[in-house]
Regions:
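Non-catalytic, mostly N-terminal accessory regions of nucleic-acid modification and defense proteins
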Residues: 1-176, 180, 241, 245-250, ...
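Conserved Class I SAM-dependent methyltransferase catalytic core
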Residues: 11-14, 18, 24-37, 240, ...
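Conserved, well-folded catalytic cores of nucleic-acid-processing
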Residues: 18, 121, 125, 146, ...
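Hydrophobic alpha-helical scaffolding
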Residues: 108, 133, 215-219, 263, ...
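Conserved S-adenosyl-L-methionine
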Residues: 158-266, 271-282, 288-293, 304-305, ...
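Hydrophobic alpha-helix feature that most strongly marks membrane-spanning transmembrane helices
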Residues: 205, 231, 235, 269, ...
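Accessory, often C-terminal, charged low-complexity segments
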Residues: 270-298, 303, 326, 336, ...
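Conserved P-loop NTPase
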Residues: 369-410
């Protein structure tokens, strides 16, 4: 049975994280990733006779496993890594980590246990990299990416820069339209600051026929990460070179000029200081300098040095995208001259995408993506800008683009259409009038969320028409809703009053005819989407492509809900599907791609070995809660086939809870009777309570006797009810075992598709509709409360309170205090 990918990766990280002890994550990754590498090449070597990595005798992952528990494990691992590196030209790539380093791994027994445990993590039988379960399943690549992200997150400031967040990489790959690159390996993609290579690989993944990858990285250890990453993703011909890109570029043509590429992607280190070393102010490669009429980037800030290198490295018909801090858009002096050169003289900058702050590892400052395109530069009339700073979700200490944010950016970019407060095509003439300052807020006005206080309304009452019209989004879709919530003020033109009680606003919204109509249309749109894809889902079989499936499902869902005039934003609906895909449906589809429509029950085993390394007894199922089915969850089957048995169990549990509550209340109410000093051995239990009862006088101690007998009655009822629940649950478990064994494939399909996938999505979409109702209710209540009391009313209330205070003071013998001074 295949394991869920998300469960596998989270287990990998959890085990690795536990084993690293106090070691810095930035150091520990060197050990974890190289073991993952050995596991991968060993699995591939077993199944792929054409696999290009050579494994010398005694250097397979199985040979590493054989070292577990040996006192010389570190020394032997170093030897095997050295042999693997020498055989494959990977010196200083896979043999950087020292497996004998006692400072990092501990001494003696601790070192042996740490390394044995690390190898054990990757012994997982489900971690088989020799085969992919689906046509688009990159188990190895996804595992490596997952671990890299977690290491970057844990590495802290300045140590996580080797990794570009996958969401940003996806945006770059989409806006460069790499899906149109159809020349296969003759297409070239270059990253001058490639880090671990994740951005390069994300760009490659977008191409329909592949490409050839080139990268350069200054840090030698990170070069090793990138080379391993390429091999692990099957990119054996990718070329990664080490060196300072600005001062020692490695990619040159036969004449010594910089080589050019079809696509260039980059996430260079932000604001590098003292970048100008062996490079000259009159650059020999023509990137900057007076001879080329290009300004020289300031020595204390290397952002434009990288951008100019990228511009020079793009082929005449090519394009590129670079992540840079927002400061490059508006800083003055030399950088302003370079902006003018790029925007007005060469017209290379096609667009700018402003990103949320605190997205990148190692820095919290906001950044942007600058898109450069040479092919259409001569005819370019302006720069397309997107202000995407507001779209994100908090993810630990960092911000992350949501699926809907990525899709919204890409859709607007591809359409090149203006969207109020979000995107705009800015003519070069307008940019020139602003002295080539590209700061996005100069050109895209932020949405006005400021609350304007109407002094007249505060003085004389009423709800300002301006405030009511700010809710125009709702009135356009539900015209009658406005009149159900507001009526013109009886005496004041231009002002409204609530048409219903404040506590009836939510009820009024839900009862409104237009709202009910559009809510029905919203439901109909979802039903239409389900009908459109039902047969496609029923036809899923082993070997299908889950990534292609979700692209089809999500695109059609977004298209349907864009056409639906709904209060719920279509991109919020899209996000519901993508989140459910990430959390649940993706795992289901990969299980189907691997094993087909199989619904197998199993009992999760928390661990296979005890602390003394002895095999623990397998846990046996006694209740429905003890068994699990990943594809077809047990609760769905219970609801569908055994609702009466479930009701009986719930009723018994309710009785149990009631008796336990009564027992707890009895103990609290009569603490003196249940004081442990009253019982043998100072222990409160049934036996001692019975002994206590025998010593009490029926008349003198009647109340205590009744209380103790009631205690025993509750305890007996609880025992009997627990026994009944166990019997009912065991009976239900037996029925479940039979039911799961008898399931046909058609039954499994119906339950998974209709009762699991569609039902879960329907619930999430209903939640989005209710969220809209809550938002409107909150806004209307806030508006009503803002002007609930006029200033004269407040003055009267204040005067009344002052009079009361003065009266109290007078009664107490104090002179009245003047408040009008």
């Amino acid at each position: 049975m295949a394991i869920k990918k998300s469960e596998l990766y989270s287990t990998l990280w959890k085990c690795c994280d536990e084993l690293r002890g106090g070691m810095d994550a930035g150091q520990y990754k060197d050990y974890v990733l190289v073991i993952l590498f050995v596991k991968y090449i060993s699995d591939k070597h077993k199944t792929d006779s054409d696999f290009m990595i050579e494994i010398p005798d005694g250097c397979s992952f199985d040979d590493f496993v054989a070292l577990k528990g040996h006192s010389n494990i570190g020394e032997e691992m170093n030897k095997k890594m050295a042999s693997l590196a020498e055989a494959n030209g990977l010196d200083n790539v896979i043999n950087v980590a020292d497996f004998c380093d006692e400072q990092k791994l501990g001494k003696g027994k601790d070192l042996v246990e740490t390394l044995s445990g690390l190898i054990g993590v990757f012994e997982n039988s489900d971690l088989d990299f020799g085969r992919n379960r689906a046509s688009d399943d990159d188990l190895m690549g996804d595992a490596y990416e997952y671990l890299m992200k977690n290491f970057a997150t844990e590495s802290g400031k300045s140590k996580g820069q080797f990794y570009t967040p996958a969401e940003v990489s996806r945006v770059i790959a989409k806006v460069l339209e790499l899906d149109k690159a159809r020349k296969g390996i003759s297409t070239t993609i270059y990253d001058p600051t490639c880090g671990s290579g994740s951005l390069l690989l994300r760009a490659l993944a977008e191409t329909p026929k592949g490409a050839t990858l080139y990268g350069q990285e200054k840090d030698n250890a990170t070069v090793g990460l990138a080379k391993m990453n390429m091999i692990l993703h099957g990119e054996m011909y990718a070329e990664i070179k080490q060196g300072d890109t600005i001062n020692d570029p490695q990619y040159k043509d036969g004449d010594g000029h910089l080589r050019t590429f079809d696509y260039v992607v980059a996430n260079p280190p932000f604001s590098t200081k003292s970048w100008l070393k062996s490079a000259k102010e009159e650059d020999e490669y023509g990137r900057w300098g007076p001879r080329n009429n290009i300004g020289i980037p300031p020595e204390k800030n290397g952002d434009y040095a990288f951008l100019l290198h990228i511009v020079r490295s793009i082929a005449r018909t090519g394009c590129g995208a670079c992540i840079l801090p927002h400061g490059v858009l508006f800083r003055g002096n030399a950088e302003a001259q370079i902006r003018k050169y790029l925007v007005a003289e060469k017209r290379y900058i096609k667009g700018i995408i402003g990103l949320p702050s605190n997205m990148f590892f190692g820095t919290g400052i906001p950044a942007c993506i600058i898109v450069v395109e040479k092919a259409e530069a001569a005819n370019r009339k302006g720069v397309f800008m997107i202000d995407a700073k507001a779209g994100f979700v908090k993810d630990g200490a960092k911000n992350r683009l949501r699926e809907q944010d990525i899709r919204r950016i890409v859709d607007v970019w591809q359409a090149q259409r203006d969207v109020p407060h979000f995107a705009r095509f800015v003519p070069i003439e307008e940019i020139a009038r602003n002295d080539y300052n590209l700061n996005i807020p100069r050109y895209i006005e932020a949405e006005d969320t400021e609350i304007l206080q109407d002094i007249d309304a505060h003085l004389n009452g009423g709800l300002p028409a301006h405030d009511v019209e700010q809710l125009e989004t709702y009135w356009k879709i539900c015209p009658s809703l406005k009149s159900d919530l507001f009526v013109p003020h009886a005496t004041r033109s231009g002002y409204f009053a609530l048409a219903c009680a404040q506590d009836a606003i939510r009820e009024t919204v839900n009862a409104n005819k237009d709202f009910r109509h559009q809510a029905a249309l919203f439901t109909e749109s979802f039903v239409a989407w389900c009908n459109q894809h039902r047969s496609r889902l029923y036809e899923l079989k082993p070997g299908h492509a889950p990534k292609r499936l979700i692209e089809e499902l999500s695109s059609s869902l977004l298209e349907i809900f864009k056409q639906d005039r709904s209060l719920v934003d279509a991109y919020d609906v899209y996000d519901c599907l993508m989140n459910y895909w990430s959390e649940t449906m993706q795992d289901d589809c990969y299980l189907i791609a691997s094993d087909g429509w199989k619904a197998e029950l199993y009992t999760p085993q928390p661990m296979t070995k005890s602390k003394d390394n002895k095999v623990k007894k397998a846990k046996k199922a006694a209740t429905p809660e003890d068994v699990v089915c990943d594809l077809l969850p047990v609760p769905i089957v219970i609801d569908e086939y055994f609702p009466e048995m479930k009701s009986c169990i719930l009723a018994a549990e309710e009785v149990l809870n009631d008796n336990e509550t009564k027992l707890s209340e009895l103990l609290d109410e009569h603490e003196d009777y249940f004081d442990t000093d009253n019982f043998a051995d100072k222990k409160l239990n049934d036996t001692n309570v019975k002994k206590r009862i025998k010593t009490l006088d029926k008349v003198k101690d009647a109340e205590e006797l009744d209380t103790l007998n009631q205690y025993l009655k509750y305890k007996e009822d609880i025992t009997v009810t627990k026994r009944l629940i166990r019997e009912l649950k065991y009976k239900l478990l037996s029925a479940l075992l039979v039911r799961y064994a008898d399931f046909t494939e058609d039954e499994i399909k119906r339950l998974v598709i209709e009762k699991k996938w569609f039902a879960a999505l329907s619930t999430r979409l209903d939640g989005e509709m209710q969220r809209v109702v809550q938002q409107l209710t909150t806004k209307v209540i806030a508006l009503a409360e803002r002007y609930a009391e006029t200033l004269p009313q407040i003055d009267l209330a204040l005067a009344d309170l002052e009079a009361k205070v003065a009266g109290h003071l007078k009664q107490m013998g104090f002179a009245a205090v003047r408040t009008d001074l």
